[in-house]
Amino acid sequence: VGFIDLATKYNLYVTVKPGPYVMAETTDQGIPRWLTLTYPETLARDDRGQMWGPEFVGLNNSIFKEKAARWLDLFAKKVVVPRQNLKQGAVIMMQICNEIGIFQWLGAKGDYSASNLKAWQEYLQKAFPELAQLARLLDRELKSYEEVAPPSEFCETRRQFVLYRLWHDFHRQVYADYVGFITDILRKAGVKTPLFTNNCGWVYGRAHEFALNGTFHRKTDKAQPDLLFGLDHIPEIVSPNNTHDGFVANQVARELQHRTGPLYSAELQCGSREHGVQPYPNELGLFYRHCIIHGLTGMNFYMFAQGKNPKGRGVDGPMFYWYNAVNYKAEHQPAFPMIQTLGQWLKFNGSFLTEAQRPAHLGVGFYPHLYETEFLVPILGKGTKLNPSKLGLNLDPVGFRDRAYFDGVIRILMKKSVPFDLADLTTRSLRELLSYQTLVVLSNEMMDAKTQAHLAEFVRAGGKLVIFPTLPTYDLDFNPCTILADSLGIKTTGRGASNRIYMDNLKDIPVPQLPQIISHRGAKVIARDADGQVAGVEKKIGKGSVRFFGFFVNYSIEEHPDLWSAMMQLPGIPRNAVADNDDLSIEARYVNNEGLLFAGNFHRMPMRSNLSVKNPRGKEMIRVGLVELPAQTGLMLPIQKQVSGDTTIVFAHAELMKVQSDAKGLHLGLQGIEGMKGQLVLKTRRPIREVKVDAAAVPFTKEGDTWRISYQQNGRVQTVSVT
């Protein structure tokens, strides 16, 4: 409370995280030790009855919920409600617990405590009102629901797989009920501020597991439509290998919120919890800008300031975080100037960003059920319980989604700066899917009947579907289900003997598995293997079309991006910005006839590209010209920015920090990169007589109805005065 009042004194907005779990590297995760010592029945337990640890509680335990309710009610009434309507220093948001489901994910185990097993039985009864339904599904005789114990063994039979599916689904219901429990307490206590929870999933600088964590709230988002799903961004080491990871995290949270409300990073890396794992200012500034151009509109640094823990309170010792913007003595550290600059830029451009859109004509299907594997395949795959071959599956779901989906399709699209959205196939309407010029779906052998029918209808209604490497043959309960294949009229006849693909001008391209051989009756052949067997077809279905390939591609050789491009016909997908090579990552956002162009260099050496960007005020692309960026730097360039009644910045090779005008003329604050040649192109009806940069005259030329100004940039905010 003292901290909140101090923030109020200095007119700083406050978000609060009262728990029950607060984590933040505190001892016992913020759960009071007296709770589990006095009431051991509150502890979460594994399948052998052993407690997970003294700080891990069962979310369904009535005693835990009673104590948590009293605490949250008290905190809400005493701290939040009196401060939520203040004119300055208000509490503006409140976090619901912290990274719900993280301990189940990290431990690869569900909660087998008595309270949770009771909830499990209730879940089964609600899901299967007739016991016979459940018995048929599990292919066994049942006399009561109590006979169905949660799974813990290796998954080698289809019955075991179905039981694990139910166990995963049950925990998602637990998380939804838990969020609802906390939300009800806070709202009844009078809290009116927005509520949010946060999703984790970055491991060693990769976000492969973020989508899995996002599925924890597959049921929460339906029960709590106003809840914000904050996301954690912990890239650690920024490089071309994880350029796409932040985008995926943004998109998963965006889909959970059904593309409404602000996209908010509740934990945006600024510093490191591990001494020796040092993020550097330039790479973080690049990462922040990349996340912003891809939709991030709310940022909470974790952590902006270093802290010193009271004795015994820090699980990692006396110091809390390293390499922050300021240390625990409030002294500026190397990251401070970068964040200060970004803050100044956001202050000027923030209103644009909250309204701007990133047009996308390509959708990439996101199928959440593919990610519901946390109890079968532990993080990093250590000690997996899943044996796909014994289940009759050709594709390991985790390896498939990581290699083909995440580091295959998504990485290639990001590398080529193709604007696209992740589209949740289980929640997007037919109309929403049809808004995309092309929908790309990576499918394994399992997909529920409703989604299969949805995709079939998408094609018949005029959609263009690109799908690979197989068509589903089972539903999620391992019942035969070929609705999509039957609707598309596509049949496969086994696997070929060569893994080399020939398509268009691409020859002898290796793929990870032997491709499926496809019957091409009534279809156009578009890909073959080295033996001439058909591995890809295209055909018309109703008003739409489908391209099916019996293979997928990794990204390990130079030709793989070109093969992906040919499969998805990427040259025909409209771009918001284009470059003459893939060395820079580029993207743009637009609103009210104005735009913002991001150019970023994720490499560890200088890179250059000739850039053009879609003109928000006309059909012709705007030629931005050659942009060369030092290693791991990025810029947000203004496009068609109205800066006065009769003057527009067509483009600049610097970030626009401020605009002022007086009797002497127009004054633009521009900040570029030290040593980079400055280019500013203005369009104005008035003749320009003189241009000065920081009071020194610089050359300019008239080109048609525009004026081009050239100068040298010094890495600081430079005032360009135009009279």
Label every PLM stretch briefly:
Residues 673-675, 681-723:
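Beta-strand-rich ligand-recognition modules
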Residues 36-219, 426:
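Polysaccharide-binding and catalytic clefts of secreted carbohydrate-active enzymes
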Residues 68-69, 76, 89-92, 145, ...:
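Carbohydrate-binding surfaces of carbohydrate-active enzymes
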Residues 19-23, 96-101, 200-205, 234-236, ...:
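Active-site beta-loop-alpha junctions enriched in small/polar residues
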Residues 185, 189-245, 275-288:
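Extracellular glycoside hydrolase catalytic/binding regions
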